[in-house]
A protein has these predicted regions:
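N-terminal accessory segment at the very beginning of proteins
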Residues: 1-168
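N-terminal small/glycine-rich loop or linker at the start of catalytic domains
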Residues: 167-175
Length: 175
């Protein structure tokens, strides 16, 4: 799998899990969550009452269920590049961020951003040169990351840096 501008490291240790096929579904279970997928279906063709892909996790004794397309009204949002022309509440400008009061967040790299741009990939150079920027070849391919961390926001940010790389410090002159 190729690196993207956001997710540069896709090779992480795999947690212990069990796998079971039952009633036409594949179940992957860890000590933190359970993923259920209806075999033979496209995971984002969902009916919210009976999704063909869902993840269930326990957040402080409350069962939280996620499925593709589920809206998160408790997401704490991302950042904005500028506050130019800002008057009042600017949250509607912001895309969803990594932290949410429901205990999960999703990074969906196949969806267009609010500005219409798409996530770009790094194309491997097979001639020994450097990888280079490219559009996605398969625009229907799924490229989603579910981050289920409960309310351990520090862990969520730490895990994000494992896949996205270290966050650079601002230049010294800004301090």
């Amino acid at each position: 799998d190729r690196a993207s501008f956001v997710v540069i490291n896709r090779h992480l240790p795999v947690p212990n899990f069990t796998q079971e096929e039952r009633d036409g579904y594949l179940y992957l279970t860890t000590d933190k969550l359970e993923l259920r997928y209806k075999l033979g279906t496209y995971p984002v063709s969902n009916d919210r009452c009976n999704p063909n892909l869902q993840i269930t996790l326990d957040v402080n004794g409350v069962e939280e269920v996620w499925y593709p397309g589920k809206q998160d009204p408790y997401n704490l949002k991302g950042t904005t590049r500028t506050l130019d022309r800002a008057e009042g509440d600017v949250r509607e400008w912001l895309e969803n961020g990594l932290l949410s009061r429901v205990g999960w967040a999703v990074i969906d790299e196949r969806e267009p951003r609010k500005d219409g741009s798409l996530s770009l990939m790094f194309e491997r150079d097979t001639n020994g040169g450097m990888d280079w920027v490219a559009q996605r070849k398969d625009t229907a391919a799924l490229d989603m990351y579910f981050m289920g961390y409960g309310h351990d926001y520090k862990k969520a940010l730490g895990d994000f840096t494992k896949i996205a790389g270290k966050i650079p410090l601002p230049p010294l002159y800004v301090f």
